[in-house]
Amino acid sequence: MFTSELIIKRNIKEKNSYELAAPLIWQDSLGVIITVPAGFVYDGASVPRVLSSIVPRFGGRYDRATALHDYLYTAGFLSRKDSDKVFYEALRSDKVRWVQARVLYYAVRIFGKKHYKKGEF
């Protein structure tokens, strides 16, 4: 579960991105804590343009989960598969509907490989 709120500011250096103004803290079901540092830049939900009306880049219940997931992919200290599992757990923790959480989870499983550990979102 998240133990902090998502506090962001628009990143004027990169189009369509935000910067964390404060750390974002996640604690998993085993008590492991992951801290996304203040200053981390992310681009929200990376979805194809055709789906952006259904899943906007920003503004959903999934915002904290997408920031966490982008950080996990950039940091690379968890495997891609484990990063995606944390993403799904974070989505459900923030009350994202089961169907939407599954769609987002499978989207990162299918299309996320090229972004893992590269910081290219």
Where are these regions (language model features)?
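Extended terminal accessory/targeting regions
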Residues: 1-121
